[in-house]
Curated annotation (Swiss-Prot):
Residues 57-93 are mitochondrial intermembrane. The gene is mic10. GO terms for biological process: cristae formation. Pfam families: DUF543 (PF04418). GO terms for cellular component: MICOS complex; mitochondrial crista junction; mitochondrion. Component of the MICOS complex, a large protein complex of the mitochondrial inner membrane that plays crucial roles in the maintenance of crista junctions, inner membrane architecture, and formation of contact sites to the outer membrane. It is a single-pass membrane protein. Signal peptide: none annotated. This is MICOS complex subunit mic10.
Length: 93
């Protein structure tokens, strides 16, 4: 007698919908922008604190200026990246 205990299991169709390319690209760009903002602002704060301690007699303004420079640089890079992504999407259409 041939007892077949292993019955073929039909693969269920994937219910997870894939995102459109433009949405996935936008999410990737935003993730990069936010991480870039965090990293550059932190580096600016670090340089500001170091300059504050070494040169400016422990004043607070160099730290704030460093955060501003870091955030501004991250904003410009994000703006450029998003505009470039928009151009690429328009070129594909």
């Amino acid at each position: 007698m041939s007892d077949s205990t292993s019955s073929p299991v039909a693969a269920a169709p994937s219910t997870a919908m894939t995102r459109p390319v433009s949405e996935a690209l936008l999410n990737e760009k935003w993730d990069r922008c936010l991480s870039n903002l965090l990293i550059k602002s932190t580096l600016g704060l670090g340089f500001g604190v170091v300059f504050s301690v070494l040169i400016f007699k422990r004043r607070a303004w160099p730290a704030f200026v460093g955060v501003g420079f870091g955030a501004g640089r991250a904003y410009e890079e994000c703006n450029t990246s998003l505009k470039q992504a928009a151009r690429e999407i328009r070129a594909q259409a």
